[in-house]
UniProtKB/Swiss-Prot annotation:
Keyword Oxidoreductase: yes
Record-given protein name: Methylglyoxal reductase YeaE
Enzyme Commission number(s) from the entry: 1.1.1.-, 1.1.1.2
Inducing or repressing factors: Expression is not significantly altered upon methylglyoxal addition.
This protein's UniProt keywords: NADP, Oxidoreductase
GO MF entries: oxidoreductase activity
Pfam families (UniProt xref): Aldo_ket_red
Reactions catalysed, as given in the entry: hydroxyacetone + NADP(+) = methylglyoxal + NADPH + H(+); a primary alcohol + NADP(+) = an aldehyde + NADPH + H(+)
Disruption phenotype: The deletion mutant shows sensitivity to glyoxal.
Length: 284
């Protein structure tokens, strides 16, 4: 079976599962394991790595920087800027600090982490300057809802936004009402963070759901793999789960070979229905 690929900016094709790094870099005793997991993921073809200056206050970027040693050219590297750094010289300084921690001289993609301190015009201008300086190749956004995207799209250069990274999983389908169809219409990929839901009752409910486990049994895979396969079954959607161990990253990579049938997708739809109306954008 052919692996599912996602097009970024029309010029880069990447596997529909990438590697997230939220919570990496917080525990020094886990660093070697985290680096090894990221490197294993790269070798398995999970070549997009997503990080942020926020994660572990820059610690996750340092872990990624170590993992990239000798492998930088194989990787599509994504980082994110705090809203209060996303304009003017602050954006230049923040990007340069991320590059130092990542031990690289460019990012493939730089995202506004969420909207806030700067007007979109200022953020777009800063992103364009960073591209001109060769520090980033593309820019995008995260945690922007449909109305935000309409506002961004009206600005000069706003339609150069390469992606929107949002929370999306079987138990949180709000983006399917208007945001996801609009992104698909623009042929702009959506990066799904927390594709297995955040830890706690919601995630446990998804992983223990009878329908999810029936499908897992039919494919001889785990419930978590079913949830990931569901996310990437949607046109133009990439999942970026975190895997802190090599075994976990191997399971994530295997999802690229899983194809849920239309009947199985219908069963999951019935268990966790799509929204009938507009809901506020979920974010964590």
């Amino acid at each position: 079976m052919q692996q599912k690929m996602i097009q970024f900016s029309g010029d880069v094709s990447l596997p529909a599962v990438g590697q997230g790094t939220w919570y990496m870099g917080e525990d020094a005793s886990q660093r070697k394991t985290e680096v090894a997991a990221l490197r294993a993921g790269i070798e398995l073809g999970l070549t997009l790595i997503d990080t942020a200056e926020m994660y572990a206050d820059g610690g996750a970027e340092k872990v990624v920087g170590e993992a990239l040693t000798g492998l930088r050219e194989k990787v599509f590297l994504v980082s994110k800027v705090y809203p209060w750094n996303a304009g003017g010289q602050k954006a230049i300084n923040a990007c340069e600090a991320s590059l130092r921690r990542l031990n690289t001289d460019y990012l493939d993609l730089y995202l506004l982490h969420w909207s806030g301190s700067f007007a979109f015009e200022e953020t777009v201008a800063a992103m364009e300057k960073l591209i001109a300086q060769g520090k980033i190749r593309r820019w995008g956004v995260s945690n922007l809802d449909y109305a935000d995207m309409q506002e961004l799209w009206q600005l000069p250069g706003g339609n150069q936004c390469a992606t929107n990274q949002v929370l999306y999983h079987l138990g949180s389908r709000g983006i399917e009402y208007d945001l996801l169809p609009w992104c698909q219409q623009q042929q702009m990929p959506v990066m799904a963070y927390s594709p297995l839901a955040q830890a706690g009752r919601l995630r446990n409910g998804l992983l223990k759901n009878a329908v999810v486990n029936e499908i897992a049994h039919a494919h001889n895979i785990s419930a978590a793999q079913v949830l990931l396969a569901w996310v990437i079954s949607h046109q133009g959607v990439m999942a970026i789960p975190k895997a802190a161990t090599i075994a976990h990253v191997q399971q994530n990579a295997a999802v690229l070979e899983v194809e849920l049938s239309s009947a199985e997708l219908a069963m999951l739809d019935k268990a966790y229905p799509a929204p009938k109306g507009k809901t506020a954008l979920d974010m964590v």
